[in-house]
Amino acid sequence: MSRPSLTRFLIEEQHAGRIDAELRQLITIVSRACKRISIAVSKGALGGVLGDAGTGNVQGEAQKKLDVLSNDILLEANAWGGHLAACASEEMDHSQPVPEQYPSGDFLLLFDPLDGSSNIDVNVSVGTIFSVLRAPKGTEKPGDEHFLQPGTQQVAAGYCIYGPSTMLVLTLGHGTHAFTLEREEGSFLLTQANMRVPDETAEYAINMSNQRHWEPAMQAYVGDLLAGKDGARGKDFNMRWIASMVADVHRILTRGGIFIYPWDKKDPSKPGKLRLMYEANPMSMLVEQAGGAATTGRERILDIQPTQLHQRVPVFLGSKNEVAAATRYHLDADKA
């Protein structure tokens, strides 16, 4: 029996009344853009796209050539379809409405065009993260303020990971599903329906080099993980860290674990490292739809009311019992 394609999956979701035709077509366009990005990434040094672009983004981060190229691919692919009202990206200071010569649709698209791009030059898996919101009714020219919706308002979220194989992981609010790109055919085929994150885990992903900058609750939590079966947790834990959120979260969706990027004192003015709107929110929706959990260490990420397009948050996501344990350390410390 042949595997269902992404196209068939989306049409069946539409027939079941879970999505409309416009959202189906938007996801199809995003998936096509991801195929183009996958081709560019896979060429590596042969494509002349490695290295810095010589520019910076709104976060003050140096842009890689592939950051800029991936951003341009997503913008161009979504400009003319008629399903989108505006886009927002990690690589752009402000949101961008669709060009006036094209019809405007009902949706807002946010994306990190190439997450983990600092790993590109060393050939580590990277990916595209995206989130879809509905434009508020009556909005003719959406601005940044129209994107400021809590993650619970997402109608779709996903990422495309460019690794040994290219995979699109998608949720439309009814489970999390993985599609693998069949390169000869050029189609994404369903390879894992209804992904499930185990409730329990003994694996965590964190950048331990920042340990000295963590708050006491975070120090205590990781200290107990490191103590293993001789400590308060009573079992041994393994640590993994790829420094590519897409790659780390993909591992967690596949076999469980907890991904952590906490607040730290290196720059106390920043509430976290990862961006809420196009990193934390879509990844949180994917993980929750797979039975996991996602918090800031104190509150559910999807409940946060954003105040800025490029707002940052701490992130704890993955196996729900371990996320609950990490959150408990922080809340108990707040009460002390």
Swiss-Prot record:
Pathway(s) per entry: Carbohydrate biosynthesis; gluconeogenesis
Binding locations of Mg(2+) 2: D112, D115, E279
Residue runs in coiled coils: none
Gene Ontology MF: a single term: fructose 1,6-bisphosphate 1-phosphatase activity
Cofactor note: Binds 2 magnesium ions per subunit.
UniProt keyword terms in alphabetical order: Carbohydrate metabolism, Cytoplasm, Hydrolase, Magnesium, Metal-binding
InterPro entries: FBPase_C_dom (IPR044015), FBPase_class-1 (IPR000146), FBPase_N (IPR033391), FBPtase (IPR028343)
Residues binding Mg(2+) 1, per UniProt: E90, D112, L114
BP GO terms, sorted: fructose 1,6-bisphosphate metabolic process; fructose 6-phosphate metabolic process; fructose metabolic process; gluconeogenesis; sucrose biosynthetic process
Sequence positions that bind substrate: D115, G116, S117, S118, N207, K273
Subcellular localization(s) per the UniProt record: Cytoplasm
Catalytic activity: beta-D-fructose 1,6-bisphosphate + H2O = beta-D-fructose 6-phosphate + phosphate
Family: Belongs to the FBPase class 1 family.
Subunit structure: Homotetramer.
Protein name: Fructose-1,6-bisphosphatase class 1
Lineage, opening ranks: Bacteria, Pseudomonadati, Pseudomonadota, Gammaproteobacteria, Lysobacterales
